[in-house]
Amino acid sequence: MKSFSFLTLSLILAGALHAQATKPAAKAPAKDDPIQLEQVDVTADKENNFSLPLDAVATSGSRLGLTSRELPASVSIVTQEMMQLRGLRTAVEAVESAVGMTGGTNFGSIPNYSTRGFGGNNVTIMRDGIRQNTASQSSRTVDSFILDRIEILKGPDGLMFGEGAIGGAVNYISKSPSPTLRSDLLASYGGWGSYRVGLGVGGPLKGTGFNYRADYAHNYTNGYQDRNSQRYDALALSVGWRANEKLSLTWFGTFLDDWNESYYGSPTIYDAVINTTVAGAVPEVRTFVATTDRMINPRVDPAARRTNYNILDNYAATENVFNRLRTDLRLTPEIELRNEAYVATQLLKWRNEESNTWNPVAKNITRGALTLIYRDDVLLGDRLDLTIKQPIAGHANRLLIGAVFERNDQIRGGAPGNVTLTIPSVTLLNPNVGYGPAAPFKKTSRIGVETHAFHLQDVFDVTSNFRAVLGLRYDHISLQRDTLFNNTTATPTPFSTFKKGYRTTTGRIGGVWILSKTVNAYASLSRASEPVTQLVSLTTTSADFSLQKGQQYEAGLKGSFLQNKLDATFAVFDLEKRDILTSTLDPVTGLRISQQIGAQKSKGAELALALSPGDGWRIELNGAYTDSKFADFNENLGTSVISRTGKRPSNVPEWVANAFVAKRFANGFSVSGGPRYVSDRFGNNNNSVVADGYVTVDASASYTWSRWQVSLRGRNLLDEDYEPVAGTTMRRLADPISAELSLRTSF
């Protein structure tokens, strides 16, 4: 019913607005027919035609209106046109097309990104520059149809987003109100009962001074795995009003509703294990221990490839609502004031059995306990910026002074105690998974996080060929955690309160050398910080630890060549995360203690090329190399401490590469496609579990008639069996080869 209500609401609203906006269209003279040139296939600007839109404003890298070419940092931009051309259905698929990015959807529909040696919560996920929470706490699968573009900034970005973002930031950008009439329609059907519908309309409301945009997307699949159906509904609205030449107001609203049955992965079966920490260890037939062991002959049984071991009544359901009001006031030609007030809410309920591991002795699957998760979050915030464009000593200068206030109130809940399953183990094939035990959601804690931040950014033209780009941000973070119920026991614990405060200063300093009209070189130093664990999980046991620090040196080149037919970016980086927790022995007591003396380092290079040689051809290539390792890290195993120094962090590939080629023919036909390569990754800090590298190939053939385009697309054409995100005792495998038929139009 929710899906129906979303669709009904969007159709009624969009239809009413579009009817109002199109009333005068019938009177338009025939000479206005060239408006057909707005079709994306025909007239998309160069910045939209490439995955390297160097002259597009990169809002994730600066609030001073700098383009990607002008910014001393690496920013990839995936436009809506790119998503449509490549058939990128979700934000995760879109992000993976960017240079050096890997991604996947974890259980419960949680996106997981990795770049430059860092992943998980080290990569912040934003919506219009606003982070609702850490990625694992609030991020959901988002249909790409409702987005204007996605921006991916590499490396620490505390300047823009505050706490977090040591590895990078992924920013979902909403569509703005449309000043011209435009409608978009998308429909597709593919394997396993998958279908997708998108409807968008926008334009001016004549005589009112208002512009609007409304987009609705419905995405459903039964899933390749048994009992893995997923539904995603998204409605995005925006309304803009220009009161006069100086004042404008714009409201953005996004409403997300999803429900899915979770597939946690296929159990990794093995013949025996070897303890890698013991010299000369012999194989043992026992349960695998991820911190010390290596499996002998690990594999997924093909007969169990589609089996879902989760309980029959599992589900993960969320509702997310984002509202943002932006006010732009031009005080003088040189001074502009911008304010953004926002509120974001999340309601999540989660009922799953999350652990299914192989028992080589009993030759069956050992199951975990019932996991119940409840989240009820409200984020309130306001961001105020003052921009001054005023020369200094005859040199152009842009200065921004800003302040941010946020209050994030979060309620967390789970099962009342350790709720065991009535069926503790099942067979590998044809398992009788049964239903989970009846257990209510119990509120366990209430967390409040308040942030006050001040920041400044400046762009100063030192000479006609050199520009200094500077930024500084100060954050004061206050945390209060009220424990309401201890869910590790059925006996309630007394009410307790924990408080913690942090102060941190981050920023970026860089320089841009203008080598020619189309080629820039740059270098920069950027910093960010984050707690040892996400703030929502912070407890008294981690109260004494300070924020972890991230620092990156980067240099690169951005330019257009061959009479602007070739766009290219190249970057080298050296990124370090310091003060990570590591275990040592107290020299006095001999006890194992945790200290912030560890480090994780990565260095590498990234190259991206986009070539438009003419005659309907389009060629794009990108690749990244990353050398990532723990520089000083001892892991506490409970009974011992073992060094992980020199080991590669989990889920970090050395090589990632993409290629995409498109050819448009004069008769309306077009073809496109290309391969993607990701090298081996490790599933644990011990580097004893390997997720094999893989190559996937997607391709499509399309026919365009008038405003309509029909496409037949093949996905994973090599039928590669692979893990998008490396696992250990369970492997969450991607879908095999599939086909999809789609229809889209714009008018």
Tell me what each language-model feature is.
Residues 145-148, 159-235, 243-247, 321, ...:
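Outer-membrane beta-barrel translocator/receptor signature
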